C-alpha cells in the first residue's frame, strides 16, 4: 500500500487543491488527499470569498463543492428593493401572517452577531431575499451537507461554532446559537446561546443545532415562527 501511495504521488505531481491550506500547491497536498481517500475522510475547501449584499459583507465557505454563507442572513430588503417589515414582539408578531423579520430581544447588537430572525412567510416570498444567484438552503441540501460530514448524527458537532454552541466547527459552517422567536403568544424570543435554528426552503421545515447534541436535527414549526436563514449558491 505504501508503494502504491508513492507511485500515485509521483504520478500526480502537484495537487490542484490546497489541502493543507498553506497557500502552496505541492506534494504534501497530494498526500493529504490520498490519505483522505484511503481513510474515507472529508475536508473543507476554504476560499477567501465574500459577498457584498445590502450594505453588509458576508463570509462564505465551500463545502463539498457547494458554496454556503458562513454567516446568518441579516438583510432587511427583498431583491427588488422592497423592505422586509421588521415587527417587534409586542407589535403583534404572533398574529402576523405576512413576511417579516425581527431582532432577537429587539436588540440590534444581537443581530450584529447572529443575524435577523425571519418568519417562513418571508422565506416563501417570490421576491427573494438571498443575493441574486443564491437561495435559501433546502432540507435536502442540509441533508447532503450532513452526509458529507459523516451523517446527521455527528454533523451538527462539526457545523457548530465553537464559541456559542460547543462544537468543533471543523466544517467552517460557523453555526451560531441565534435562538428563535416562537409563534405562540406566551413565549416570545427563546434559546439564544443554546439553539441555532435555520428555516429551509421547504415549507415549515427547519434545521437545528443544539449546544448539547452532536446531531443536525430537522423539525417543523408554524410559519409565524422566527428563525435564522442561511443562503446557498444556485
Language model features: what each stretch is:
Residues 43-234:
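Conserved positions within compact, well-structured domain cores
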Residues 6, 29-32, 122, 144:
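Hydrophobic side chains within alpha-helical segments
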Residues 2-13:
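Sec-dependent N-terminal signal peptides
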Residues 12-13, 32, 129:
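Alpha-helical transmembrane segments and their juxtamembrane interfaces
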Residues 19-43:
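Alpha-helical segments with a strong preference for the paired helices of cellulosomal dockerin domains
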Amino acid at each position: 500500500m505504501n508503494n502504491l501511495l508513492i507511485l500515485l504521488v509521483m504520478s500526480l505531481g502537484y495537487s490542484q487543491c490546497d489541502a493543507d491550506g498553506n497557500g502552496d500547491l505541492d506534494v504534501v497536498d497530494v498526500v493529504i488527499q490520498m490519505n483522505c481517500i484511503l481513510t474515507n475522510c472529508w475536508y473543507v475547501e476554504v476560499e477567501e470569498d465574500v459577498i457584498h449584499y445590502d450594505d453588509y459583507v458576508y463570509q462564505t465557505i465551500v463545502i463539498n463543492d457547494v458554496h454556503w454563507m458562513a454567516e446568518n442572513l441579516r438583510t432587511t430588503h427583498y431583491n427588488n428593493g422592497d423592505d422586509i417589515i421588521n415587527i417587534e414582539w409586542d407589535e403583534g408578531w404572533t398574529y402576523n401572517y405576512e413576511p417579516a423579520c425581527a431582532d432577537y430581544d429587539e436588540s440590534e447588537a444581537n443581530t450584529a452577531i447572529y443575524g435577523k430572525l425571519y418568519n417562513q412567510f418571508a422565506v416563501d416570498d417570490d421576491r427573494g431575499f438571498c443575493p441574486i444567484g443564491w437561495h435559501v438552503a433546502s432540507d435536502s441540501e442540509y441533508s447532503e451537507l450532513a452526509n458529507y460530514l459523516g451523517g446527521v448524527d455527528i454533523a451538527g458537532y462539526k457545523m457548530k461554532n465553537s464559541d456559542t454552541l460547543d462544537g468543533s466547527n471543523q466544517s467552517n459552517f460557523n453555526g451560531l446559537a441565534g435562538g428563535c422567536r416562537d409563534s405562540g403568544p406566551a413565549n416570545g424570543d427563546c434559546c439564544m446561546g443554546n439553539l441555532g435554528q435555520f428555516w429551509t426552503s421547504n415549507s415549515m421545515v427547519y434545521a437545528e443545532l443544539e449546544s448539547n447534541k452532536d446531531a443536525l436535527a430537522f423539525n417543523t414549526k408554524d410559519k409565524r415562527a422566527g428563525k435564522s436563514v442561511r443562503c446557498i449558491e444556485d
